[in-house]
From Swiss-Prot:
Gene that encodes the chain: uppP
NCBIfam families noted in UniProt: PRK00281.2-4, undec_PP_bacA
InterPro entries: UppP
Name of this protein: Undecaprenyl-diphosphatase
Membrane topology: Multi-pass membrane protein
Organism: Shewanella loihica (strain ATCC BAA-1088 / PV-4)
Length: 266
């Protein structure tokens, strides 16, 4: 990989990981237009690590409070709002784990193509618009409850289909279930931690068993750029949605879907 490819793909991964616009749709366009080959497991580890570090550092206080409350609840059997939130996020992670292990090969073989990505980009963009218009004041992430957490978890599992967008699917489900925009985004971002950590472990496992040469320059640069892009993305996304809602991202998804359709039929 040359430096330009590393910069472009790392920034795309960092920016699109937490915006409801689908990272796979953005990663496929440079590959299609510029003829780039697959970036390899080493680079996947780098950009996933950068994104994971960004959300952990940005929400470090919340995650620390949740972790200490959760571990305390295991001993005392008494629940606080932080420990409940931790349990709900654990519950919401289960569907993605099950679906990921059972459908991984099918998705990679049959659904990882530009036609599917174009369709899901448009369809889930329209669903995001519907959920955002349906939403009013909403409630906070501390009022989710186990039923809603599980439903949002199923949405996260569905996001394994390329083009859906993990944050897009979970935010859409959270809005439809009554969370406020900011709470939906925060819950989605917190949900990403166990999923991203698990995915990173699996990728590292695959990397250790492969014969792929490690490009340390791409590793360091990809991690750093992905971290910075993801951190800034989280910060400004939470500010934008409080004022403008999801409409800009819906319009962007529809435009991107249209571009992908042009690429398909060109």
């Amino acid at each position: 990989m040359d430096i330009f490819q590393v910069i472009v793909l790392a920034l795309i991964q960092g920016l699109t990981e937490f915006l409801p616009i689908s990272s796979s749709a953005h990663l496929i366009l440079p590959a299609q237009l510029l003829g780039w080959q697959d970036q390899g497991l080493t680079f996947d580890v780098a950009v996933n690590t950068g994104s994971l570090l960004a959300v952990v550092i940005y929400f470090r206080r919340e995650l620390f409070s949740m972790f200490t409350a959760w571990t305390s609840s295991l001993v005392t059997r008494q629940q606080t709002q932080e420990s409940k939130l931790a349990w709900w996020i654990i519950l919401a992670t289960i569907p993605a784990v099950i679906f990921g292990f059972t459908a991984k090969d099918f998705i990679s073989t049959h659904l990882r193509n530009i036609e599917v990505i174009a369709t899901t980009t448009i369809v889930f963009g329209l669903l995001l618009w519907w959920a955002d218009k349906l939403n009013r004041e909403g409630f906070s992430e501390f009022q989710v409850g186990w039923k809603k957490a599980l439903l949002i978890g199923f949405a996260q599992a569905m996001a394994l289909i390329p083009g859906t967008s993990r944050s897009g699917a979970t935010i859409t489900a959270a809005l439809a279930l009554g969370l406020s925009r900011e709470a939906a985004a925060r819950f989605s971002f917190l949900m990403s931690v166990p999923v991203s950590l698990g995915a990173a472990i699996l990728v590292v496992k695959d990397l250790l068993s492969s014969q792929e040469a490690i490009d340390y320059q791409a590793l360091v640069l990809g991690t750093a750029l992905s971290f910075v892009a993801a951190y800034l993305c989280i910060h400004y996304f939470l500010k934008i949605i409080s004022r403008m809602g999801m409409t800009p991202f819906v319009i962007y998804r529809l435009a991107l879907g249209a571009i992908l359709c042009v690429v398909i039929f060109a």
